[in-house]
Amino acid sequence: MDPFLVLLHSVSAGLSSSDLTQLKFLCQNHISKRKLELAQSGLDLFTVLLQQNELNAEHTALLRELLCSLRRKDLLLRLDDFERGAAGGAAPEDRDLRAAMEIICDNVGKDWRRLARHLGVSDVKIEAIEEKYPRNLAEQVRELLRVWKNSTRENAAVSCLVGALRGCQLNVVADLIEEDQRARALQSGSANPGSFTAWDSGSAAPGAS
C-alpha cells in the first residue's frame, strides 16, 4: 500500500471528534461547504484534498499546517517519520539536500529571516511564513526551506544553502553541513574532496522571490 495513504489513515484514526470539527473549520478555504458537511472523518477530508491535488506525498505542507493548528505534536511526529522515510528512498542528491535542511532546522533558530533574504526569499513571503506559524519558530524555519525549495525546484542544492549561510555569517551551521556531507560521501564511497570547494565561494543562491 502507498506509504502516504497509510500515513493519512493513521493520522485520521488519531483524530478526536473535536479535532475533526476544527479540521473542517480550517479546511473551509480548501473544500466546499457541501463536501465538508458530508465528511465523517479526517480521511474523508484528506481524500478530497488528494483529488484536488492540494495534498500528496511530495507536497505535505498543507497537512503539516493543519496538524500544527490542531497542536497535535504526536501526529506531526508521524509526518516527520514519513518524510524521513521518503528521503531514504530518494536520489542521493535529494537525500543530501534533505539532510542539510534538517541541520538548518535544528540550528538556525531566530536567524532564519536573515538566511531567508540571502536565499532570495522576498519580504512578502517572509511575512507570510510568520503569519502562518506565529508562535512556532521550528515550523517557520521548515516553511522557509519548503518555500525556497519549491521556488528553486531543480536548482535547489546544498551548495546554495551553504553559500547563503556563509553570506549571513552563520558559519557554524555551514560547517556542520559540510562535515555531514563529507561523512555521507565517504559512507557512500563517492567522496570527492574537490566537490566541497565551491561551498566556500559564497555563491549566490537562485532567486526565490
From Swiss-Prot:
Domain DED: 3-81
Domain remarks in the Swiss-Prot or TrEMBL record: Contains a death domain involved in the binding of the corresponding domain within Fas receptor. The interaction between the FAS and FADD death domains is crucial for the formation of the death-inducing signaling complex (DISC).
GO CC terms, sorted: CD95 death-inducing signaling complex; ripoptosome
PROSITE patterns tied to this protein: DEATH_DOMAIN, DED
Death domain sequence ranges: 97-181
InterPro entries per the UniProt record, alphabetical: DEATH-like_dom_sf, Death_dom, DED_dom, FADD, FADD_vert
Disulphide bonds in the chain: none
Biased composition range(s): Polar residues: 187-200
UniProt keyword Phosphoprotein, yes or no: yes
Gene3D superfamilies, sorted: Death Domain, Fas (1.10.533.10)
Protein's recorded name: FAS-associated death domain protein
Keyword Phosphoprotein: yes
Subcellular location: Cytoplasm
BP GO terms, sorted: apoptotic process; cellular response to mechanical stimulus; death-inducing signaling complex assembly; defense response to virus; extrinsic apoptotic signaling pathway; extrinsic apoptotic signaling pathway in absence of ligand; extrinsic apoptotic signaling pathway via death domain receptors; innate immune response
Ranges for region Disordered: 187-209
Keywords of this entry: Apoptosis, Cytoplasm, Immunity, Innate immunity, Phosphoprotein
Function: Apoptotic adapter molecule that recruits caspases CASP8 or CASP10 to the activated FAS/CD95 or TNFRSF1A/TNFR-1 receptors. The resulting aggregate called the death-inducing signaling complex (DISC) performs CASP8 proteolytic activation. Active CASP8 initiates the subsequent cascade of caspases mediating apoptosis. Involved in interferon-mediated antiviral immune response, playing a role in the positive regulation of interferon signaling.
CDD domains for the chain: Death_FADD, DED_FADD
Transmembrane segments: none
Pfam families the record matches: Death (PF00531), DED (PF01335)
Free-text description of this protein's post-translational modifications in UniProt: Phosphorylated.
